[in-house]
Amino acid sequence: MSDKILVFGHQKPDTDAIGSSYGFSYLSNHRPNGALNTEVVALGTPNEETQFVLDYFGVKAPRVVKSAKEEGVDTVILTDHNEFQQSISDIEDLTIYGVVDHHRVANFNTAAPLFMTVEPVGSASSIVYRKFLEANVEIPKEVAGLLLSGLISDTLLLKSPTTHVTDHKVAKELAEIAGVNLEEYGLAMLKAGTNLSTKTAEELIDIDAKTFELNGSNVRIAQVNTVDIPEVLERLSDIKAAINASMTANGYDDFVFMITDIVNSNSEIIALGAHPEKSEAAFNFTLADDHAFLAGAVSRKKQVVPQLTESFNK
């Protein structure tokens, strides 16, 4: 096996998954003491928002891999995730050298000690930025741009309840290094990810989707950002058909789909599967035609997953 270490974010990568992995790979390769031989890769192609970021800063998208072993590699670093079902296909057969994440730790174990940093901040990119400072490694403009974009994406330009008090300082400093106006660039970037008109229903429910094991149930939780929830709901029947087909094909017990209005900071929730009552209890609403409005909800990590976890555990 090669001595190379692959660095990647989760399946169906978002901007933070790609930004944090790109940044951490660069840092790992340029540490003054103990540099590693890493390559940033991805577990999927960039979405429209992420492609906007890559084009803006002139960065080539990481190549997509399906299996580390097929690459002749047996050691990996994970960013923006830790749960095995969200990772590379052969994760259980690999050595995990390190993890940089800002999510819950679950369905994760290793046979050997590792470097692991998990913090309740707005993005994995925020953590990577601080690691640059700790290592005293200069951040190139394009790397700063990718890290900034990961933070903007995950916190909806610092408006999400997942935003940590330290993220504001991180965003300001990264914007200065990247040479962008935080507000202007952030809005343009977020809007680039809201063009859903060209997406099929099958693509919509798969743009940003993660699988969670909740008390023995396999629950898929997906999210799309928009500036017009009613426009998306015009396609409700097609979306529900796509969700049902996905559950059948992939063995999901339940599927929760968040349609998030990034302007007004609300979401519409579509919930299908074996336990719709768990969603109703989690969010204290009543589903009508399998969907309901959830005021103030923009974060899957903080406003959906914990509530569903508690509901499924009852």
Curated annotation (Swiss-Prot):
Q: Which UniProt keywords apply?
A: Cytoplasm, Hydrolase, Manganese, Metal-binding
- Main localisation: cytoplasm
This entry's comment on the bound cofactor is: Binds 2 manganese ions per subunit.
Localization in the cell: Cytoplasm
Gene Ontology molecular function: any one: inorganic diphosphate phosphatase activity
User: Residues that bind Mn(2+) 2, according to the entry?
Assistant: 16, 80, 102, 154
- Asked if DNA-binding is a keyword of the record, the answer is no
Q: Which EC numbers does the record give? A: 3.6.1.1
Cellular component GO terms, alphabetical: cytoplasm
Requisite cofactors: Mn(2+)
> Where is Mn(2+) 1 bound in this sequence?
10, 14, 80
* UniProt catalytic activity: diphosphate + H2O = 2 phosphate + H(+)
**Gene3D superfamilies listed in its UniProt record:** DHHA2 domain (3.10.310.20), inorganic pyrophosphatase (n-terminal core) (3.90.1640.10)
Top-rank EC class of the record's enzyme: hydrolase
Q: Which family does it belong to?
A: Belongs to the PPase class C family.
**Which HAMAP family does the record associate with it?**
PPase_C
Q: What is this protein called?
A: Probable manganese-dependent inorganic pyrophosphatase
